[in-house]
């Protein structure tokens, strides 16, 4: 539990009590002050709740990232072994795929730069 939540709850309670005293005494200023303190306490309590939620979400995300990092070596190794098996099973297909990828990359890299369209100006 966050400090802001505790302080906010205390302010909210104090504001309710002050508002009740203002109601009993018939003092509008005390009643308004109590309502203002209650509202401030509610806002601070909500702020503390939001901070707690963000903290929990960041801890969860960090845990997921750590798990993904820990398992990345195994995943890479398994993928490499699967590709090696496919290449051994069908070497001609692997050669054609590699050639196609190389050809596509060569086309992308050797493409001429686009020129801007000519501007036609009328001088008259």
Curated annotation (Swiss-Prot):
InterPro entries with a match to the protein in the record: CsbD (IPR008462), UPF0337_stress_rsp (IPR050423), YjbJ_sf (IPR036629)
Spans through the membrane: none
What Pfam families does the record point to?
Answer: CsbD
Question: Which SUPFAM superfamilies does the annotation name?
Answer: Hypothetical protein YjbJ
The record's similarity note reads:
Belongs to the UPF0337 (CsbD) family.
Q: Provide the protein name.
A: UPF0337 protein blr1496
């Amino acid at each position: 539990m966050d400090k802001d939540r505790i302080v906010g709850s205390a302010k909210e309670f104090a504001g309710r009590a002050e508002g009740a005293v203002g109601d009993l005494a018939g003092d509008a200023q005390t009643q308004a002050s109590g309502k203002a303190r209650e509202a401030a306490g509610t806002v601070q309590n909500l702020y503390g709740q939001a901070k707690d939620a963000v903290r929990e979400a960041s801890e969860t995300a960090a845990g997921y990232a750590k798990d993904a990092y820990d398992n990345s070596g195994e995943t890479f190794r398994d993928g490499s072994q699967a590709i090696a098996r496919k290449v051994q099973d069908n070497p001609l297909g692997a050669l054609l795929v590699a050639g196609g990828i190389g050809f596509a990359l060569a086309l992308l890299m050797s493409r001429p730069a686009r020129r801007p369209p000519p501007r036609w100006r009328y001088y008259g």
